[in-house]
């Protein structure tokens, strides 16, 4: 029975150590380039502007005018 407690303690300590080794977080820098109906492919438009963006996505914001969907480009930085 004592060896099970020892093994579980070792696993808990090891997992806590791994938490400190993992980087804090990965943040995405974004720039919105226009409404989605203006671009046929938001992903291709973001990669095509050659500012180092990794991907693009149509994002829905609060409904303002007619089209709430905006094409936003993202760049992942560690």
Curated annotation (Swiss-Prot):
Record key words, sorted: Antimicrobial, Disulfide bond, Fungicide, Plant defense, Secreted, Signal
Subcellular location: Secreted
Cellular component, GO annotation: extracellular region
Gene coding for it: LCR43
Leader peptide range in chain numbering: 1-28
Predominant cellular place of this UniProt entry's protein: secreted
Family assignment from sequence similarity: Belongs to the DEFL family.
Pfam family, one: AtDEF-like
Top-rank taxon: Eukaryota
GO BP annotations listed: defense response to fungus; killing of cells of another organism
InterPro entries reported for this sequence: DEFL
Protein known as: Defensin-like protein 74
Cysteine pairings via disulfide bonds: 32-73, 36-58, 42-71, 46-72
């Amino acid at each position: 029975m004592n060896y099970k407690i020892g093994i579980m303690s070792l696993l808990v300590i090891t997992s806590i150590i791994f938490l400190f080794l993992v980087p804090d977080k990965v943040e995405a820098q974004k720039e919105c380039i226009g409404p989605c109906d203006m671009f046929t492919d938001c992903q291709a438009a973001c990669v095509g502007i050659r500012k180092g963006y990794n991907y693009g996505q149509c994002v829905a914001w609060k409904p303002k005018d007619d089209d709430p969907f905006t094409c936003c480009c993202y760049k992942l930085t560690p």
